[in-house]
Structure formats: structure tokens, C-alpha cells
Amino acid sequence: HAQLDLVINAVEKGSNPWGCTDYLNQKKNIWETGARVYEFMGAHSCHTKAVLIDDRMSIVGSYNMDMRSTYQDTELMLAVDCPELNSIIQAEMERDKTYSKTMGNDSEYDYGENYHSKDLSFGKKIFYAILRVITIPLRRFL
């Protein structure tokens, strides 16, 4: 079977509190699928929406991997059969992985060579703890 790699903003860096808390609630389920999730901590947030299939097919667009994009917003994805585009996006993704942490097979984080940790402030930890409860019944609308 194919390996699925996801590059997402780390919760410590994310600018969308609803998305961050939904990820915290769903993190275990996502990891259990076998996907490798790279939690990005670069200088800027990651805003790329792309799926790469083999070395040719790239799917790019505006779709966010959240419930709001799935059920409420009008989103667009475009499939492009172009090895050159795929190569460019792949290189960007590989670079972003060096600024990321990912869960290893031993359930410990592995850190990219450019990863720099950042702790959540006490206030943000409390805020996220409250939002994690609120997002459960409202998840589809956020």
C-alpha cells in the first residue's frame, strides 16, 4: 500500500484555533490510519493544499482538510498530470518536512533538522482545552 504523508501546521504554530483543537481531538485517529503527519514549525504557517500521487499527478486547490470545507464552503481542487509541477510541489513538501516533527514508529517524535520547538503559552493551553470540548458537537460547522 502507498504511504500517506501529511504536512500540517503544528498546533503551537497554527493560526486557526478551531482547526488546531479539532486536530488535537482527532490526532490519535489520524495516526492510527498509518499516515505520517508532519507538524510544521517553519517561519510562516503552511497554507499549501496539495495531494501528490506518484511522480506525475498533483491535486491542488482551496480545499482545507476540515469539516467546514467538507460541508459548508465551496472549495475547488484541480487534478494536473504534470511531472514538472509534481516535482516542484514535492521539493517544497520535502523542505517543509525538515521544519516539522512527526511521530515515529516507537510513538516518540522524530524532529526534522530545521525544527525549532515552541511551547504553547499557559493561556493558550487553557483556551485549547476549552475549545476541544466545544468543538466536539460543533465540529461539522467549524
Which role does the model predict for each range below?
Residues 1-142:
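PLD/PLD-like phosphodiesterase catalytic module centered on the HKD motif
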